Amino acid sequence: FACTANAQTGITVTGRVTDDAGNAIERATVTMTRLDDGTKLAPVITGNDGTFMIDSISEGRYTLGITCVGYDKYNKKLRVSGPLDLGAVVMGGSAKMLDEVTVMADYSSVKSNGTITVRVKGNPLAKGLTLLDFMKFMRGVSVRGEDVSVYGRQNTLIYLEEQEITQEQMKTIDPSMISHIDVITNPDASYGLGIGGVIKIYLRDDGGVLGTLTFNGRVSQDGLLRALPGLNLLYARGKVRVSNLLTGSLHDKSVRSQVQNDVADNVETQTETNSVTRGNGYLMDNLALRYSPTDLDRIYVYGGVRMSNGETSTNSHDGTDFLNINSLSKPRYYSAGLQYKHFFRKDSVSYFFFRGSYSGQDYSEGLSYVLNSTADNARLGYNTNDVWIDPVLHMVLNKKSNLNAGLVYGYMYDKHDDTGTTQFGYIRDGRYVSSGTDYGAWVDYSTKIGKFLYVQGTLNYHGTKSVFRDRIDSKNNVDLWEDGIYPSIFAQWNLSKEENPSPAKEFYINFNYQYYYSLPNYNYTLPTVTWQGQNQYSIGNPDLTKENHHDFYVWLAYHRKWTVYYDFNYGDNLVKVIMHADPDRKDTYFTRPENAGWQIQHKLSVAYQTKVFDFWYTNTEMIVRNRRESMPGKSVSQTSLYFSTSNNFKIAKNYGITLDFAASTKTKTLSYEYDGWFNLNAQAYMSLLKNKLNVNLSYNGVFYNRPKMTVYGDGWMLTRKYLSHNTSVSLNVSWNFSIGKKIKDNRDMPSIGSAGRAIPTF
């Protein structure tokens, strides 16, 4: 059951709230009011299966009231003389609410721990939109291009219920399959340290077989860029549940063009580079199985695989020399995991949770370099194995207080075997092994003080052992041990003076301080050389160490329209990608990550969400950021402005258009300067055949500019301007279907994510 009100004595009233079709209605508010004196019992919220329970009720006559956005209000008079099970309570759909653009706040709520829950099922704003487009209208979520984050913070994680997935996998899930989404603004230590936020997607609980067929295509002036079909399935019967996410590629291509001007010793050189990457087909599949041997136990087994073949061709010339780089790669990713969850009692929410996961990667890449008429070859390869184990204990101490504790162990082993070029010296031979071991322990305590103040404190210990072994030159070996204790505290105060305020009365403020570390991207620590063109390459740095951050933020939600967010961050030993002139190659530059100095950043965000007219809903945000960075011999201080607005115009019940505009002023960092930019996207969408068929046609880059990046060095300056076509047309089509009996209790369905590697370049 979702929630229990009052003391655990007296008469109990239970029931299950459904719609006309028998589907469970979750997060409906249930109230009971005595007819003789008007006394109201504390409201409860229905769970994922639509059930509710109200206890400690005395005998008498009551009015049962149920409300939920998108449905007509339900009222019924009851006589209570003993335990009462109402069975299915049916709510009718509200035609008025579903025919107009509804304020997203009506479909969202804020929990005492700061988590924002957005109901997707039945939400009019979800009709015809992709999940990524729908998220543009969610409070607390920032969508920039195809990247999703919580309040624009780094290190945002995406979960499909209890298992982390990639943003690529998230985009394959159609909103029609989703029950609700939790935006966790204050993730506890079980998600890791230094996590900016968590977006947690919960699937619907109806349909013996619930599925979606999808197709995503994109074309531009460069031809067909993308043709991606997908199939998502969720099936349950008895104690067994199976989910499967399957995505493939018929065609995948990206084109990138740039012009670069280098000025050194008053001599200017211009280089043009064109790069075309083709995915010669890929297949990604994630399968998850859940078995419930008893009402108290959940066992999950899951696995995934991603196989692809890629080809990249890069041409670069400076008027004198012509360089062609061809790459053929075959990456393979695979993963598996086991989870076990045990509830201590049938009516308890206390539990023990164990998670063990394994992931591996096999990668091989053949490289061909042709400089003018001379050819040379290289080959790169690595094998990576990664294991994580983390048990968690969640204890409900009383109605107001919780205690969580957990342990973390992780081990990674990465073996590289690179054969370098023999004539040009572009790639060195590499025989090295990198390994790492993580140890952690954490505990957090949360409590509610009075009715309106929630406080949570966390203490986290983490240690990391990093080992790098160069099999060719032992002078490059690195042994590193880093550890620390990292505290955090969070508080949320409900200023509306109602325990469950309506969206129109919401008034929350929360505070958070945390001291955390941030490890560099793993690929940054590898000495692998990657050439981006004739006169630029990148190389990793095995000597990198962790960053340290102190972060404090204040979040204010006023009524349904306004959200104000302020964040202060101080970080030292920061990892920055720095560009250098190659002393051995004229007019050649390389980027390398380095622990370089410190940063103080202030960020103020003001977001406004409202229904301007019955047909127009807008979500607009303005961010002002002041950042000061400093390293020996150089410092940068700058204030920048970012603006974005997403607008949904409802033309008819199942048709509409959206317009998205974003812009930023010039930004400066220790690494580079980047000109201001702007971009406008438009799309038309429709939902047909009782929302089973959704079609979305997007025109990306209606108008935009091409900003310039500038890097300054000792006696040299480099400018780069991208010339790629940003205008494209995308088509997204999804067909939703369901077969069989209803699925109940759709908790904790896992899926598979995969680790990502970043190249240390701009």
Per-range role (PLM):
Residues 132-164, 202:
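Extracytoplasmic beta-strand/coil segments of soluble accessory domains associated
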Residues 192-199, 207-256, 280-283:
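Outer-membrane beta-barrel translocator/receptor signature
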Residues 163-188, 285:
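Short acidic/polar hinge/loop motifs at secondary-structure boundaries
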Residues 85-90, 100, 104-106, 131-134, ...:
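N-terminal periplasmic accessory domains that precede
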